[in-house]
Amino acid sequence: MSGMEVWSDPPRSCRMEQPATQQVATCSFPQNIKEENAYCLYDSEKCPKSAAATDLSTFPRLTSESCSNNDTTTSGGVPVPGYFRLSQAYPTSKQTLYSNTGQVGASPFVPQSQIRFGTPPSSASTPTELGRKGSEGTSPGHLTCSSEREEAEAAASSANEESSPVPSESNKNSPEKETKGEVKAENGANWLTAKSGRKKRCPYTKHQTLELEKEFLFNMYLTRERRLEISRSVHLTDRQVKIWFQNRRMKLKKMNRENRIRELTANFSFS
């Protein structure tokens, strides 16, 4: 126990004071100081009345803190019995500190309050007003004219596309076929053309038609065996040869009928 007594603090007769931070948190002000805090304003020497009015309306926390600090500095000469106050120990440093913070805090927030609570700027409303005026200024006649122009342009573009046909790949790759087609069109007396000048559809080549015409001269009606032989020699199917002979017989019958009518009409003279 003797060693512990050496290292431990000696017994003190007086009461130890609590640290300053705890005392400041638990300190209480008299009734007259609290009433002054409720009706506190900035001093006329530090800031003008207009700035004080705007700061009081917009920033109540700043004003309450600064007012309480000013009251403590001004009432530093009145000591409170039984309590330790920081204003008694450091009066000058606190005055300079809070006076600087009050000035710095008041200056940057004044333009913000003017911007927020003032009249809205005219530049923000100008584009909307211009858009409304432009929409109101456009008359229905102008809208109808623009719609008619667009329809006319669309119709003209579609007509140009239809009038200019896209050249097929076969025409691009084979110019010789074009010359052959032109030569055939020039021959008006060709047996492939009718009296009206319209070109008939002919799925047979010239060699095939010549072979079939030769066989038709010998025999108008073919047996099945002979039809198969001709189809092999001409590289056609049995059905194609059969259809060609049927059409050729109908054509011959029509030609005979026309010739008979022509002979009968030639004998009678109509006056």
UniProtKB/Swiss-Prot annotation:
PROSITE patterns according to UniProt: HOMEOBOX_1 (PS00027), HOMEOBOX_2 (PS50071)
KW Transcription regulation (keyword) present: yes
Gene3D superfamilies: Homeodomain-like
Superkingdom of origin: Eukaryota
Swiss-Prot/TrEMBL keywords: Developmental protein, DNA-binding, Homeobox, Nucleus, Transcription, Transcription regulation
Molecular function terms, GO-annotated: DNA-binding transcription factor activity, RNA polymerase II-specific; RNA polymerase II cis-regulatory region sequence-specific DNA binding
Keyword Aminoacyl-tRNA synthetase belongs to the record: no
Polar residues compositional bias, start-end: 61-76, 109-128
Pfam families named in the record: Homeodomain (PF00046)
Bias-annotated ranges (Low complexity): 154-173
Record feature DNA-binding region, as residue ranges: 197-256
Intracellular or extracellular location(s): Nucleus
Compositional bias of kind Basic and acidic residues: 174-185
GO cellular component terms, semicolon-separated: nucleus
Region (Disordered): 61-82, 109-199
Family label: Belongs to the Abd-B homeobox family.
Described function: Sequence-specific transcription factor which is part of a developmental regulatory system that provides cells with specific positional identities on the anterior-posterior axis.
Official protein name in the record: Homeobox protein Hox-A10
Protein's organism: Heterodontus francisci (Horn shark)
Gene designation per UniProt: HOXA10
